[in-house]
């Protein structure tokens, strides 16, 4: 992927945020946001493939709140509502998770782990397996469509689900937080 632009670089109330986009011939949008302070570090990215091939997005969250509380999430997030996507050869989730409803834009393979900072590297091999599977899917299909309406339900659902807007409103103000959510994170909803 190639760096495209920096959408935002903010500082407020002891918190920093950067929001960037990247390009690739097979992706409509690839975006990442990094939010950090002395007390926490949150990284989120979603890759939106070009359309016409029924491919999922790939999403990843790495959230560190303190030394002993880190949450790792990565998944194939299908743009169709009520569509249980599954990738053979990868582990299936063993439980339901708050915020992540399998079959409703989240796959059976959603990977969620709670760990410490020291344990994060233990999950790199699994992340590489997921990312390799995603890369293989995209390279096999070579998506080329640009119909962003395919992501309308997905982004609308994520806008309602994601707690980042409320968190950021307290740090950067409601107007900036709403702009990040609607103009950067989930633009198609």
Segments the model singles out, each with a brief description of its role:
Residues 1-68:
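Short Lys/Arg-enriched alpha/beta "domain-start" segment
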Residues 44-150:
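Extended, non-transmembrane interaction/recognition domains
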Residues 7, 11-14, 127-141, 168, ...:
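Hydrophobic, Leu/Ile/Phe/Ala-enriched alpha-helical segments that form helix-helix packing faces
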Residues 140-189:
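Alpha-helical oligomerization segments
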């Amino acid at each position: 992927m190639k760096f495209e632009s920096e959408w935002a670089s903010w500082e407020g109330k002891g918190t920093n945020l950067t929001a960037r986009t990247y390009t690739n011939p097979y992706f409509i949008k690839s975006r990442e946001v990094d939010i950090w302070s002395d007390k926490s570090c949150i990284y989120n990215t979603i890759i939106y493939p070009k359309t016409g091939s029924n491919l999922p997005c790939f999403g990843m969250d790495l959230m560190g709140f303190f030394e002993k509380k880190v949450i790792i999430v990565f998944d194939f997030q299908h743009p169709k509502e009520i569509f249980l996507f599954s990738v053979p050869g990868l582990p299936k989730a063993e439980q339901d998770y708050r915020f992540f409803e399998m079959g409703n834009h989240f796959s059976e393979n959603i990977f969620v782990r709670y760990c410490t900072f020291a344990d994060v590297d233990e999950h790199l091999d699994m992340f590489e397996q997921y990312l390799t599977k995603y890369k293989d899917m995209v390279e096999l299909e070579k998506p080329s469509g640009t119909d962003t309406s395919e992501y309308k339900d997905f982004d609308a659902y994520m806008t309602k689900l994601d707690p980042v807007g409320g968190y950021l409103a307290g740090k950067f103000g409601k107007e900036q937080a709403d702009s990040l959510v609607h103009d950067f994170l989930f633009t198609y909803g």
